[in-house]
Amino acid sequence: MPHVYVSNALSGDIHVMQWADTGRLTLTSTCVVGAGPGPICISPMTERMYVAKRGEPNSLVCLQLDRTHGQLNLLYEMPLTARMCNLRIDRTGRFLLAVSYHSHSLTVCPLTPAQPAASNHTVMSTLRHPHAAVFSPDNRFVLVPCLGDDGVMVFGFDESRGQLTLHTQWQARAGSGPRHLCFHPEGQWLYLLNELDATLDVLAWDAAQGTLQHMQTLNTLPSGFTGKPWAADIHVSADGQFVYTCDRSSSTLAVFKADAQRGALTWLAHVPTELQPRSFALDVDGRHVLVAGQKSNHLGVFERDAQTGLLTFTQRLATGEEPGWVTCLA
């Protein structure tokens, strides 16, 4: 059965949830990891989950993952150089990339069966407030949205050694604050969510050259909202037909339809969510969207219409304190 994992920063645990035969999501177990668990990343190649703890000291927790029952067991915990806001594993499963907004850095960590040595970590500290990292579909590049630079840095990635080399930079609008991005499943378009003005950029991706070209900009906030923008997360459906974003100030999800030929987006709807949605996820079969309310300590469950992309609220489930990350696994 598919499982859902929610990291809870203040209660220091990860909630493991599972879909029941009734179609309702239920809590099945809780894994205590200590104060400050944040971003979660699941290895595509092994039975392991990695969680960045954002406290003193900052650390990376490695958990053994039971894909059948969803249970988690601690394997090791190792120090990190900084407070991390995003984790990604490359498509070979050999390297983990950790992003630190506060320390302006990227850390590349080789993944081994045993605990990696800290001396094997490569740290780059030439960026201004990077917030995420995404590997290109062919694993040749890493794209890093940098809120402080108002741009997306593109690094060449040597998957044999885990080495990053600055390749180029795409410049966003001043004050937009690039935060999170995701590729369209076909690989030729990229969707970039900007935190500070809550806009969404559609970019064309040249896989051969490793370059970006701007195509479109849209507003993700509901009409009439006058608060300060604070966009957080973005995901695209597996079929590439719909893009979803969230904003913490308005506590809403925005739904967009993607043009199959050009990748351009058309706004469809805004949906109210739990208070301050910092993270959300589409489940593995695309039937649900799960939204973590960072200030409500609840997970909102929405049923997703695969044909229209629209969402219907179906369930509210208690989490630990201050849920900041949600992810799904088959």
Regions found by a protein language model. Give the residues of each.
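Loop-centered beta-sheet repeat module
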Residues: 142-199
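Short loop/turn segments immediately following the C-termini of beta-strands
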Residues: 9, 54-55, 101-102, 111, ...
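Short loop/turn segments immediately following beta-strands, especially the blade-tip
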Residues: 17-23, 63-70, 109-116, 155-163, ...
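Beta-rich, blade/repeat-based domains predominating
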Residues: 34-45, 80-94, 124-139, 172-189, ...
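A short beta-strand motif characteristic of beta-propeller blades
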Residues: 26-32, 73-78, 119-124, 165-171, ...
